[in-house]
Each structure stands twice: as structure tokens, then as C-alpha cells.
Design a protein with these regions (language model features):
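Extended hydrophobic
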Residues: 172-242
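Short, structured helix-loop boundary elements
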Residues: 4-8, 62, 66, 79, ...
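Short, solvent-exposed recognition segments
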Residues: 122-197
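Cysteine/selenocysteine-centered motifs that mediate thiol-based redox chemistry or coordinate metal-sulfur cofactors
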Residues: 155, 161-164, 242-256
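All-alpha effector-binding/dimerization core of bacterial HTH-type transcriptional repressors
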Residues: 74-122, 147-150, 176-182
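Residue-level recognition of conserved beta-strand positions in structured domain cores
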Residues: 105, 115-116, 127, 137, ...
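N-terminal helix-turn-helix
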Residues: 1-84, 243-251
């Protein structure tokens, strides 16, 4: 089992003291946590240096929470908003196509599925909320990788060789880069048997209020229901669904 770092625990204990007090002095922190004054001083200096605490001048000097904590809380709240809103929108998209609809986010070199609404057909895609797949093998993953800037994409590709889930998976980094350029230009991605030879999938990006691609929505179905009309029909549907979800997250096309 990994070792717990006492200094980190103490720093978190300090931050949690501010849950019921807007400002605290070093003496109050010391008394509440029963820690040595030198330890508290070092932790407070470190938290101030990183912006997690702000110094309030006076006698005595006091401290209050800094902006990074608000940003972390906002990021967490934003993820909750994404899931809540996505559940509603994916149900509407699934009702329109009667195929599996997913919303996923990028986590390192993988995608993680946050929301899924299944089709009513007896033959359907095998997936689940929380499932992880190599991003480059999926339509949602390609959308999310294409949204990264060059350094971020380089970092993902540097994690190791590109895994092959099927013979159709893209395993060459330069070929993937070229493919992502096309995805970026078109705003839509496809998985043509790259994660499962029996499945087809199309995806589009979901943007937040700042215009950042924070998730991707997809429509997936087995090849037995794939027709020449499917790509165009599903692409239009997933674009519309992703745009609807983006709007619910505060994105406005007229402002970008």
C-alpha cells in the first residue's frame, strides 16, 4: 500500500479549517490543529506561495482561501454539470436514432465514458459508464485528441506505443497526427471498426462556456445496421446533439 505523506495531510487539514471561518491567523491554525508553530509557518508559506491561501495584512497577519481552490471547485462543479446535462441530451439523441449514445472525456491517453444511453435493439454495443479505451481507437477519443494543442498531444503520444485493438486501429503516430488534422478540420470523427470490428461510430465535440472541447458525444451501432445513409444521418444527429449539450454548458457560437 502506498505511503501517506504527513505534510500533505497537514496542508489539507489547514485548508479545511477555512470551511467554517473566512480568515484565520497562524496562531489560530496552530491551536486548532495542535501542531508546532514552525510546521504551521512552513505550511502557510507554501500554501501562500502556490496561491491556495492569501495573506490579509494586519496585526496579526491573517489568511484566507485563494483563487486556485475556487478554480478547482468550479472544475468539479463543471464536471457534474456536464454529466447532468449530458444525461438529458443523450436520451433525446438515442430516442431519435435508437442506437447507443455516449459522452466521454479524455484522461491521459484514454477516454472514459461518463454517460451512456443504450438502444432498444437486441444486438447492441457492449459498453458501460466508467469504461476506459485507448483514445486513438475511438471516435470520441479522436475528437478529444484533435482538440489538444501540439505540446499536449505530444505528451499523450509520448506515453508509449499506440495500442492496437483491431487490425483497423491507427498505430503509427505520424499517421494519427495527419488523421487528427482532418478531424480538426471537419469537426467530426469516425471509428470504422478501430475499437471493435463489428461496430461503427461517429462523434462530435462538446464545448464549455469558454469554447473549450471538454467532452465528445457519439452514436454507435453494429455493422448489421450500418447502411450507406448511416454516416450522413448519424453525423448530422451527433453534431446537433453535441451542439445542444454545448449550449447547455454555456457555449455560444456567436461569441467565438
Amino acid at each position: 500500500m502506498a505511503r501517506v505523506v504527513p505534510a500533505v495531510i497537514r496542508a489539507l487539514d489547514i485548508l479545511e479549517l477555512f470551511l467554517d471561518r473566512p480568515e484565520l491567523s497562524a496562531r489560530e491554525v496552530t491551536e486548532r490543529l495542535d501542531l508546532p508553530r514552525t510546521t504551521v509557518h512552513e505550511l502557510l508559506v507554501t500554501l501562500v506561495e502556490r496561491g491556495y491561501l492569501i495573506v490579509v495584512p494586519g496585526q496579526p497577519v491573517r489568511y484566507r482561501l485563494g483563487m486556485p481552490l475556487f478554480q478547482l471547485g468550479s472544475a468539479f462543479a463543471g464536471r457534474l454539470d456536464l454529466v447532468r446535462e449530458a444525461q438529458s441530451v443523450t436520451r433525446d439523441v438515442a430516442a431519435a436514432c435508437d442506437e447507443a449514445v455516449h459522452v466521454a472525456v479524455l484522461d491521459g491517453a484514454d477516454v472514459v465514458y461518463l454517460v451512456k444511453v443504450d438502444s432498444t435493439h437486441p444486438v447492441r454495443m457492449v459498453s458501460a459508464v466508467g469504461r476506459r479505451l485507448p483514445a486513438h481507437c475511438t471516435a470520441v477519443g479522436k475528437i478529444l485528441l484533435a482538440a489538444l494543442d501540439r505540446p499536449a498531444l505530444d505528451g499523450v503520444l509520448a506515453k508509449g506505443p499506440l495500442a492496437s485493438m483491431t487490425p483497423a486501429s491507427i498505430t503509427d503516430a505520424e499517421r494519427l497526427r495527419a488523421h487528427l488534422e482532418q478531424v480538426r478540420a471537419e469537426g467530426v470523427a469516425a471509428d470504422v471498426g478501430e475499437s471493435d470490428t463489428a461496430m461503427r461510430c461517429v462523434a462530435a465535440g462538446v464545448r464549455d462556456h469558454a469554447g473549450r472541447v471538454v467532452a465528445a458525444m457519439s452514436v454507435s451501432a453494429p455493422i448489421i445496421r450500418w447502411t450507406p445513409q448511416s454516416p450522413e444521418k448519424w453525423t448530422a444527429l451527433v453534431r446537433e446533439g453535441a451542439a445542444t449539450l454545448s449550449a447547455r454548458l454555456g457555449y455560444r457560437t456567436t461569441s467565438h
